[in-house]
UniProtKB/Swiss-Prot annotation:
Residue ranges the record marks as coiled coil: none
Keywords: Membrane, Transmembrane, Transmembrane helix
An example Gene Ontology CC term for this record: membrane
Topology within the bilayer: Single-pass membrane protein
Effect of disrupting the coding gene: Does not affect the production of oxopyrrolidines A and B.
Taxon lineage: Eukaryota, Fungi, Dikarya, Ascomycota, Pezizomycotina
Stretches that traverse the bilayer: 30-49
Annotated compartments: Membrane
Claim: Transmembrane is one of the keywords in the record: yes
Function: Part of the gene cluster that mediates the biosynthesis of oxopyrrolidines, polyketide-amino acid hybrid compounds with feature structures of tetramic acid. Does not seem to play a role in oxopyrrolidines A and B biosynthesis.
Name recorded for this polypeptide: opdI
Location of the region described as Disordered in the Swiss-Prot/TrEMBL record: 56-101
Name of the gene this protein is made from: opdI
Extent of Polar residues compositional bias: 66-81, 91-101
Amino acid sequence: MRGYRSSQRTFFRGFDPRHAYRFRGDGRHGGMGGALKIVFLGMMTYFIAKKAFRSSQHPPTDFNAPVQSVPQRAQRPSDTRLQGPVLLASNHPSGDSASPE
């Protein structure tokens, strides 16, 4: 134990380690205790992981409303260009062709 004492003296360098009980994890002298720290960290990890998993899922839905699936024919193919307001300018009754192409 003599080597432990000398290394402890050089490690703490200036303050008495007997008064450093707040930094130890034993439950006797005001510390939280090792088991309590592990439980707390485990709970925090669980809740953070649960929140991250839920946010990566689909957006939250109203559980009282029935789930409606989108019919297959209502979905657009992914390779078509945007139709709608962009091409409506060429159908203007003035006769001008304002087509961007």
